[in-house]
Amino acid sequence: MAEKEAKHHVVLFPLPGQGHIGSMLKLAQLLSTAGFYITFVHTERNYRRFLLTSTSFNVPKFRFRTIPDGFPDNDPRSPLPFIELQESLDTKCKGYYREVLVAVDEEWPPVTCVVADTALPLALEVPEELGIPVMILAPHSAGSILTGYSIPQLIQGGEFPFPEDADMDELLQGVLGLEGIVRRRDMSVRGFKSIDSPFVRFEVKMNQNLSRGRALILNTTESMDSLALRHIRSICPTTYTLGPFHVLLRNIKDQSHSASLSEEDRSCIAWLDTKPNKSVVYVSFGSLAAMSREAFLEFQQGLLDSGYHFLWVIRPDMVEGGLEECELTASERRYFVKWAPQEEVLAHPAVGCFLTHSGWNSTLESIYAGVPMICWPFFADQLINSRFVSEVWKIALDMKDLCGRSYVERMVKEVMSGEKGKELRKSICEMADMVKKSAEEGGSSYTNFKELIGHIKSLSLPACSSTSGF
């Protein structure tokens, strides 16, 4: 059969968390524009949530397949504990995933390759056992990859674990390519005192898996991450930078579907419409961050004392002990929603600053919109992301671990109307222009995407007829 008539089938399997699902689903939509058959693997729990918020999802040759997550349906925890979820998927769900990969469907071709989330070893290991080519998606930042990959070197060099009384602002020397940039506080493993901690072991394994695929796919651009990419390619020579996914998808398809597992409250757009340009602080700490009631009150009072309007995403499970409904009453100055259409919010002319947890998707969306940030990172890659945007790219302020009301007030005023804020705005607008050009025809992300398509087409179809192991 001539190549132009060949049918190619890509299976994508993300870690079952909002940020990872969002990145993988945008990549899946990108790949579907090449005419590939796409199978997207969801856990049953997340797929039920997805159907409640994404009823209009309709893409040709695109299907969802589900596997259990190994937890009882009535488990009230949301999100499920990260390490427990990893272990449950690994021990209870391999057979279900294997069946997705080997199932015969007369209307669908065999699997050409799998795109596996680097944070989900199961997604990589099962297709390897079946002889199916695998590519790796690392949905976090390039800086996060290097810090995670360097953990064994930090252990060997005696820089990790950190002493009990360690100065968390001290710079580390053992981080590949980022010497003199990364502080102790920027490491995802900063809170762990033993190298045998399950999370430390997971971080090491996850980053060792990067080079096991035929290629590494990153949601970044050559211009943003040239420093880190040079070292990443020494580990993974075939690395495709396609970021930002949401921008590239818009340029290629002029349409994308939401990946949100939570219902977006669009009433906030009407509220923003009533506000002057660059007068609103948008506040969102993502889908996982939690805070004490005391921290919530300090943040809120600092925002009020700043004198600016603010729109705040408050998930029902975000504040420990919950909040009374009267505490979330909207006013002329403040507005609360459980979840927001974030890309649209950041693009709104009324928004002048983003108080963020520094998740990578949020960071990219803020850069594209040209909105400077104030960063209050919570865990994982958010820590190094905050360091990069504040110290390397100089498009944000880093709050470290502080959230006192006077500190919040000062930070907001600095970004919204201070001299530092003018510098941040200028820098992020310049970066936004670079990012947009990367995703345009002829730009690095656009060109790399076309090369990735060619790479996938070049992969031979595996023989997956044997299912005796299931």
Swiss-Prot record:
An anthocyanidin binds at residues 20, 380. Keywords: Glycosyltransferase, Transferase. Its EC number is 2.4.1.-. The keyword Glycosyltransferase applies. One of its GO terms (molecular function) is quercetin 7-O-glucosyltransferase activity. Signal peptide: none annotated. Pfam families: UDPGT. UDP-alpha-D-glucose binds at residues 340, 342, 357, 360-362, 365, 381-382. The active site is at residues 20, 117. Expressed in young cromes. It catalyses: myricetin 3-O-alpha-L-rhamnoside + UDP-alpha-D-glucose = myricetin 3-O-[beta-D-glucosyl-(1->2)-alpha-L-rhamnoside] + UDP + H(+). It is an enzyme of class 2 (transferase). Pathway: Flavonoid metabolism. InterPro entries: UDP_glucos_trans (IPR002213), UDP_glycos_trans_CS (IPR035595). Transmembrane segments: none annotated. Glucosyltransferase involved in montbretin A (MbA) biosynthesis. Catalyzes the glucosylation of myricetin 3-O-alpha-L-rhamnoside (MR) to produce myricetin 3-O-[beta-D-glucosyl-(1->2)-alpha-L-rhamnoside] (MRG), a precursor of MbA. MbA is a potent inhibitor of human pancreatic alpha-amylase and is being developed as drug candidate to treat type-2 diabetes. In vitro, is able to transfer UDP-xylose with 50-fold less efficiency compared with UDP-glucose. Belongs to the UDP-glycosyltransferase family. This is Myricetin 3-O-rhamnoside 1,2-glucosyltransferase UGT709G2. The lineage of its organism: Eukaryota, Viridiplantae, Streptophyta, Embryophyta, Tracheophyta. The gene is UGT709G2.
